[in-house]
């Protein structure tokens, strides 16, 4: 049985140092520009990413706009949105692996409806990243226990907060 190792603080410190680099900062700005034009933000994720989606919903709603998370991806009627409503929605998809089947299938629905999707994932080479309008990758070492992915979610948490504050700043600067 594989057991998780102790938390590698240096990996997280390195991520935080990289977060202000031009590439990552540019992706955050690009995603924020898309979200600033939306009236509603929908968060999706499975497993620990679902917990972060719920956090994102609360955090975004507190800072700048109405948002929600989808707890049960298949039972949510995303395909029932009108074209007009779809234009007002932005999706933030959270997935460490970027390969979560339920998340991928929902992204397909969103893309088909013309909804912009922002992926926050560990690699921009993942399927979810390739499907999304904008990808914000965080590139940290993945870790699995015998039953689950136990990769740190701190980078994704940080990116959700930074993205929300960037959108808020953009909207407050507009006349």
Per-range role (PLM):
Residues 15-19, 34, 166:
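Residues that form generic nucleotide/phosphate-binding pockets
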